[in-house]
Amino acid sequence: MKKLLALAVIAPLLISCSSSTKKGETYNEAWVKDTNGFDILMGQFANNIENLWGYKEVLIAGPKDYVKYTDQFQTRSHINFDDGTITVETIAGTEPTAHLRRAIIKTLLMGDDPTSVDLYSDVDDIKISKEPFLYGQVVDNTGQPIRWEGRATTFADYLLKTRLKSRSNGLRIIYSVTINLVPNHLDKRAHKYIGMVRQASRKYGVDESLILAIMQTESSFNPYAVSHADALGLMQVVQHSAGKDVFRSQGKSGIPSRNFLFDPASNIDTGTAYLAMLNNVYLSGIENPTSRRYAVITAYNGGAGSVLRVFSNDKIQAANMINRMSPGDVYQILTTRHPSAESRRYLYKVNSAQRAYRRR
């Protein structure tokens, strides 16, 4: 059965991968059309922002950056999940503090459902939640977490009195307030998904520490994560490459929807299934489990085909070459000779993060 599965899926897998380039080397006409359309949308979106905010002030949502515009693109909330900061800004010419106040409150109290928020419009579709996404990740000036509107409102007023800043972009005055997340904000977010990670780990036989390391590196546990290549969610799965491959292996037709991949449990399941496919099918010819893990990590970012081509254009010969090397040599080659600088850095980042999770 395993061999039959391998035969069924190995061809598309050899030229398709998950989250970097992003990620797939297969020519797929529908995917190209969708990608071109997405590129056009992003270009128009960025142009609208540049016209209002100025060239150096363009901010767009990314894997580790939540950016939401409102008020006809005059106000925006930016959560930088790497730096651990929330910055709310406005260029509104009238009552700027009122615009900031409203945006601060909504950002502090927003839920964790990415399907309910359009990050590529100025529609104010942010819903106040009884279980805010940022609860526990940010505290007010008294050191208390923020769950209710009353506390969020009081904190917003405090911020506007004590932390309001302004600068000029050459066109307009930008008013802003910055809030720091708590020092362990990354762990706070990761904790939300531990149960889902454990379930996927047991289902597909993938180490929990690897799943968590991939999530941290891909999105910093940001469920709203998007990318310039339209990779989606916590594990940055692309619908037309990794998503399609996983669906095919599970006997499903088509591709996962955006809403499906923005659901944390579905995203983690799909991303983990893809890791298992890379390990058990695509890169199964690599015998040493540590060497194979290095290859799987790099392939999740840049494609399995590109990993093997680092060693040989012939995939069987590539596996044989890897099998004659020590894991340390394989790691050294992948982090220095892979043609993609992003993939070289990716292996280092994920491997370092996985070591940290293993020590816990």
Curated annotation (Swiss-Prot):
Chain residues carrying a lipid of type S-diacylglycerol cysteine: 17
Membrane topology, as annotated: Lipid-anchor
Keywords, comma-separated and alphabetical: Cell outer membrane, Cell wall biogenesis/degradation, Lipoprotein, Lyase, Membrane, Palmitate, Signal
GO molecular function, one term: hydrolase activity, acting on glycosyl bonds
GO cellular component: cell outer membrane
Recorded catalytic activity of this chain's protein: Exolytic cleavage of the (1->4)-beta-glycosidic linkage between N-acetylmuramic acid (MurNAc) and N-acetylglucosamine (GlcNAc) residues in peptidoglycan, from either the reducing or the non-reducing ends of the peptidoglycan chains, with concomitant formation of a 1,6-anhydrobond in the MurNAc residue
Lipid-acceptor residues (N-palmitoyl cysteine): 17
Enzyme class name: lyase
GO annotation (BP), single: peptidoglycan metabolic process
Enzyme Commission number(s) from the entry: 4.2.2.n1
Subcellular location: Cell outer membrane
Coiled-coil parts of chain: none
Signal peptide: 1-16
Cell cycle among keywords: no
Function: Murein-degrading enzyme. May play a role in recycling of muropeptides during cell elongation and/or cell division.
HAMAP family named among the record's database cross-references: MltC
Family membership: Belongs to the transglycosylase Slt family.
Protein name: Membrane-bound lytic murein transglycosylase C
UniProt organism field: Salmonella arizonae (strain ATCC BAA-731 / CDC346-86 / RSK2980)
The organism's taxonomic lineage, starting at the top: Bacteria, Pseudomonadati, Pseudomonadota, Gammaproteobacteria, Enterobacterales
